[in-house]
Amino acid sequence: MLYLEDYLEMIEQLPMDLRDRFTEMREMDLQVQNAMDQLEQRVGEFFMNAKKNKPEWREEQMASIKKDYFKALEDADEKVQLANQIYDLVDRHLRKLDQELAKFKMELEADNAGITEILERRSLELDTPSQPVNNHHVHSHSSGEKRKHIPSSHHSTTDHVPEKKFKSEALLSTLTSDASKENTAGCRTNLSSSSTNNVYNVNSSQPLTSYNISSLSTGAAAGAITMAAAQAVQATAQMKEGRRTSSLKASYEAFKNTDLLGISLSRDSASYSSSALASTLTQTLTSSATTDSRSGRKSKSNNKSASQQSSSSSSSSSLSSCSSSSALAHELSHQQTAAIPESDTNSQVDWTYDPNEPRYCICNQVSYGEMVGCDNQDCPIEWFHYGCVGLSEAPKGKWYCPQCTAAMKRRGSRHK
């Protein structure tokens, strides 16, 4: 995993080598320019004095001027060769970097399948300028925190850490794989301990994001989706009991329509996401139900029958919470499974193109496949892909691009 250190050590001398070669190329360029200026002056003097001197002198001067021209041409060729050597040097280091990145990607994929695509997308999101944030979801941040994104919570207790490593590890955090067993166990525990205040205190004091954090080997995309949905349900659980049912549906609709940082689900993590989400939703709703029952018992501590009624209502709330979370998880599973083909299609990102490679054609893409050149010497684009200009084979005779053709027609109509 020391690819970065090895590569940095390899290119340590590259800046000095490039500086020396560019300096040498600049000196050769000045030498050629000075030689050309002197030759132009000699040619002018030669033609001025040609009629006054003998033919032998003219031939001698002509041969000397030609010799100096050939020498300047050789220096110019050497300068071009030096530029090609510099290009090959940089290109060789770029190819080496691509190879090292490919090896590092293979190691990451071996440990966590599909993690490289998530990290690449996250890196692109961090490099793109931040968009205006909705005030209903996230408080306004300072310019130093523009790159931090909080999914859908009104309250933020996470300190800003700019390192990508921390954010990547946060994406790797997932919930337990056996969520269905924990879902049932959570319901039973809530029913059996409805009269114990210590259990209520523990459940209500733990933050939602601390539930069921397990190993990094499971799907990171499923963990991110589960965390976002759980935070939405946590905000719902804090509302009044009369508004909780309708607001839970609204929270689910808002979660379903959210892009969730652009992370696409893989087929392997879809089923896992639904089960882990069921476990998290169960614990959240169970915690809210027990909190309501605790407040009810606290206000009626002197009435024994009222306390028993509160305990029974807590049990019924727990049962309804478990059934609601299971139904919501089942519905989410269907939504995720239906969205998998589209997300797989849209998530195909080509990472092989060099960002410094020239762009051509009206599509502003790199050179690939068969291309045709515009015969207009002043064409700003010059090269076009066959498919972009509606060609299936090489055109016969001269060919002009649509822009140049339209410009020529406009000039022709003006002359008429």
Curated annotation (Swiss-Prot):
The PHD-type zinc finger mediates the binding to H3K4me3. Residues 156-165 have a biased composition (Basic and acidic residues). The record marks Y360, M371, D375, W383 as: Histone H3K4me3 binding. It comes from Xenopus laevis (African clawed frog). Residues 177-187 have a biased composition (Polar residues). Its main location: nucleus. It is found in: Nucleus. Residues 136-152 have a biased composition (Basic residues). Gene3D superfamilies: 6.10.140.1740, Zinc/RING finger domain, C3HC4 (zinc finger) (3.30.40.10). GO terms for molecular function: zinc ion binding. This is Inhibitor of growth protein 3. Keywords: Chromatin regulator, Growth regulation, Metal-binding, Nucleus, Transcription, Transcription regulation, Zinc, Zinc-finger. Zn(2+) 2 binds at C374, C379, C401, C404. Zn(2+) 1 binds at C361, C363, H385, C388. Residues 189-198, 283-293, 302-319 have a biased composition (Low complexity). Belongs to the ING family. SUPFAM superfamilies: FYVE/PHD zinc finger. Interacts with H3K4me3 and to a lesser extent with H3K4me2. Component of the NuA4 histone acetyltransferase complex. InterPro entries: ING3_PHD, ING_fam, ING_N_histone-binding, Zinc_finger_PHD-type_CS, Znf_FYVE_PHD, Znf_PHD, Znf_PHD-finger, Znf_RING/FYVE/PHD. A zinc finger (PHD-type) spans 358-407.
